[in-house]
Structures are given as structure tokens and as C-alpha cells.
Amino acid sequence: MKAHIHPPYRTVVFHDTSVNEYFKVGSTIRTDRVIELDGETFPYVTIDVSSKSHPYYTGKQKTFASEGSAARFRQRFGGFIDAKRKA
């Protein structure tokens, strides 16, 4: 194996700016920014979405009807079809 070809693996602080949460995670990401957290200095990366802010993980996900397209069609236009059959 070749020596010194792998990027350095270190603890990095990711900051979810949408909910102001910080995560310490092992990563090889490169950044010039640093932050002091818990008395230590870590590389710092901002992110827009994390498990603390994504609707799927927070339970604020919109649920769509599990019905098929035919059921939705009947729900929307069923009154017209029934009225025409009775006439």
C-alpha cells in the first residue's frame, strides 16, 4: 500500500444552520474554517439539512394519500358520474 495517499480522518463539527444544532462527526472533509466547542478546536462545516431539521426525521413530513389515481378520480368526479347514471 502507498503511504500518505489517504485524506486525514478527524473529528469535524457540522453546524445545521436551519435549527442551530452542532454535530461532532468523524470525517475527511476539507475546510479552512475552525470552531471552538467544549474547549477544543475543530474543523467547522455549515450544512442546510440534517437529521434534526429534515422533515422525514422530525416527523413533520407531509403524507400523501395512499389511494391510487382511480380512487382520487372517483373522489373528485364521482358526483358527476352518479348524477349522469341516474338521469
UniProtKB/Swiss-Prot annotation:
One of its GO terms (molecular function) is structural constituent of ribosome. SUPFAM superfamilies: L28p-like (SSF143800). The keyword Ribosomal protein applies. Keywords: Ribonucleoprotein, Ribosomal protein. Gene3D superfamilies: Ribosomal protein L31. The keyword Lipid metabolism does not apply. GO terms for cellular component: ribonucleoprotein complex; ribosome. GO terms for biological process: translation. Belongs to the bacterial ribosomal protein bL31 family. Type B subfamily. NCBIfam families: L31, PRK01678.1. Part of the 50S ribosomal subunit. This is Large ribosomal subunit protein bL31B. It comes from Klebsiella pneumoniae (strain 342). The lineage of its organism: Bacteria, Pseudomonadati, Pseudomonadota, Gammaproteobacteria, Enterobacterales.
